[in-house]
Amino acid sequence: MFRPAVIAATAAVLWCGSVAAAQAAKVIRHKIPNSDFPIAAAVEVPAGKATVYVSGKVPAVVDTTAPKGSAAAYGDTKAQTISVLAQIKQQLESLGLGMGDVVKMQVFLVGDPAMDGKMDFNGFMEGYRQYFGTKEQPNLPARSAFQIAALGNPLYRVEIEVVAVRP
């Protein structure tokens, strides 16, 4: 017959082992088959990992020499994407995280009047590729991108929100 102390000790060892295994488990990023497009087809987050939900970020003024409240002050879709991702990077770093910890991204793009009201997806991708799928930061998030009618400021073309996982 087992003594209560032996049972308790065995349970504690098993519990500690399962916690260590959960903490050691890594985020798994599934690539899109036969594609070099820089997003993940899916991302698996193991049990026990904390997720961080970052509210949508919109562009800051990128050209302080442009007239206040002008489209030039906020830049094109590429410039706005870079501005937004820089803010997200800063927010994540303030939380002890980085862009490589992002597992999910939702992108809201407003149509560009210079493109007959269509979203500038190529401009977005030029900015996005500076932060994701690079040699320095190869981790890719699962991502959705939508064209929407408008954002809070009529000069905004980009809003991005992300979910990150603590390593």
What does each model-identified segment do?
Residues P4-A9, L14-A86, Q90-Q106, D112-P167:
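N-terminal presequence-like segments and the immediate start of the first folded domain
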